[in-house]
A protein has these predicted regions:
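Short catalytic/metal-binding and nucleic-acid-binding patches
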Residues: 1-164
Length: 164
């Protein structure tokens, strides 16, 4: 998220991410191992199972969600920060030569390869504890917008391949 803006405080914007991840799972070969939507960023551990490079899959996801969320912000009559948010996205876009008007996602968040089981476990624990560290919940599995529920034996919002 550019400038670490707190966009995902509204359920409708988080739902756009959830629906987009579901679409990528069903149609683009996205296999999710862990995820978490925070107010100003998203964590995702995934792989591409249909031969598409992870960075291209992530790029498609980011392009679609940036357009969909900006459109949702524009149309949301309850969005008290509408003009300010759009101004921030436009300002960020003006700094980048490959952005037409608005920049929603940061350009420096690229997929990285997780090279060992130890590192994977560390990253999953970090992701799941993010809402606890932010004071949003007391236990990771209590946070709805995360795969921590799946790892605690409950069913979360998305299909997740739990790593044991």
């Amino acid at each position: 998220m550019v400038e670490w803006l707190d966009v995902f405080t509204r359920t409708e914007y988080k739902n756009i991410l959830i629906e987009s991840l579901e679409f990528c799972q069903k149609n683009k070969g996205l296999e999710i191992f862990a995820w978490c939507i925070m107010t100003n960023h998203v964590h995702l551990i995934f792989r591409s199972i249909e031969g598409q490079k992870p960075e291209l899959l992530l790029g498609d996801f980011k392009r679609f969600t940036s357009n969909a969320i900006i459109q949702a912000i524009r149309q949301n009559y309850r969005e008290s920060r509408k003009e300010w948010l759009l101004e921030q996205f436009e300002k960020a876009g003006s700094k980048s030569s490959n952005v037409n008007k608005f920049q929603f996602w940061r350009h420096d968040n690229k997929p990285i390869e997780l090279w060992s089981n130890k590192v994977i476990d560390e990253k999953i624990n970090y992701i799941h504890n993010n809402p606890v560290e932010e004071g949003l919940v007391f236990h990771p599995e209590d946070y709805m917008y995360s795969s921590a529920r799946d790892y605690s034996g409950e069913k979360g919002l998305l299909d997740v391949f739990v790593i044991k």
